[in-house]
Amino acid sequence: MHDHDHDHSHDGHHSRRAFLGSAAAAGASATLPGLGWAAVPQVGDDMAKAAGAWLAKLDARRRSQAQLEWTNRRREDWHYVPRGRPGIAFRDMTPEQVAAAWDVLGSLLSARGMDQVRGQLKIEAVLGELSGSLSFRDPGNYSLVLFGDPTGTAAPWGWRFEGHHLSLSAMVAPGHGVAVTPVFFGANPAHVPARHQHAGFRLLGEEETAAFGLIRSLDGAVRSQAIIGDRSLGDIVSGPGRELALQRVEGVPLARLNEAQRDGVMRILQLYAGTMREEIAAAHLAKLREAGIEALHFAWAGSQAPGRPHYFRVHGPTALLEYDNTQDSANHVHSVWIDPQGIFGRDLLKAHYQGAH
C-alpha cells in the first residue's frame, strides 16, 4: 500500500433533530456579530482549563516545547503529511500527560469527534502493519502544541493537535469567540481490507455514503450542473497555505435542489461540524443559515460508483468542505472543512484587535 501524501511547502453524539434544533436556538439567541457565537464562551473556558491542566503536568523543558508564542509562525503552518511538528508527541508523554492531552481534545470535540480521532490513530497503526513501516506509521506520532497563554484572560491563544491525516486547530479570542478551522480528516486505508483484525472499518464511511446517496438522487439538468469533471480532482484544492484557493463556487446551488436533497447536503456538513461540541456545531450551522443555505453549492467529480476515484465539494460564503478519494485505488481519503471567513480565527482576531484600540 502506497501513501502519496507529499509535503508541498464532552457532549455526546446528538441526533440530527437535536442538532438542528440547538442550531436554531443558537441563531435565535445571538445578537452579536458572527451569528450563533453567543453560546460559545463556555467552550473557550473549558479549553483554557484543560490546556492549563496539561501544561501543569509538564516539566520546564517539556513546557517550553509545548507552549510557543502566539506570534510564532508555526501557528498557521498546518499539514497532514508525516513530518516534524512543534509541541509534544503522544509517544513522548507520560500516561498522565497523555490523559491530560485527551482532555484538551475533549474540551472541544463531541463524542463523535473523539471517536474520529481514535479511529485515525487506529488506522495509522493498520497502515503501519500493511506497509511494514510500524516506526514511521506510529499512532504515538501525533502532537499537541499551544500558542499563547491559556491561563490569561484577555489575549488570544490557541492549540493544534496534528499528525498524519489529522489536523485540528482551535483559537480563542476572549470576548469574541472560538475558531476551529481548518479541520483535516484523512483515511488510509479508507476501507480496511479483509484478513486484517479491523477488516471492514471505514473511518469516513458515513460521510462518503451520504455523498453517494446525494449524487444519485440528482437527475437531469440538476445532476449535470453538479458534475464539474468526469475525473476526480486527485486531491483537495484547499490544502495548507491554499485555504482560499477556491474563489469561485462551482456545481449546483442548493436553491435548485428539493428539500430532501438540501437535507442531504446539510447532512454532510453536519457530519463534519458535528465532530465539534454542540455549541460550536450549532454556531456554524446558524452562520450557514444566516448567509442563506440556498447560496451553498454542491459539486462532484469522478465516478459515481463506490470504490472508484471520486471527489465532492460543498462551497458557500461561510463553509467549504472538500473530500477526495483517489489515491491507492480509491482507498485513501483526504478531506478538509474550512470557514472561509474565519480561517485560524482571522475574523475574530480582527474584531479583537479593533476592540483593543
Task: Please give the residue ranges for each predicted region.
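N-terminal twin-arginine translocation
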Residues: 12-18, 28-42
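Sec-dependent N-terminal signal peptides
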Residues: 21-22
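N-terminal secretory signal peptides
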Residues: 1-14, 25-29
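A cross-kingdom marker for long, charged
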Residues: 40-60, 65-81, 86-92, 96-110, ...
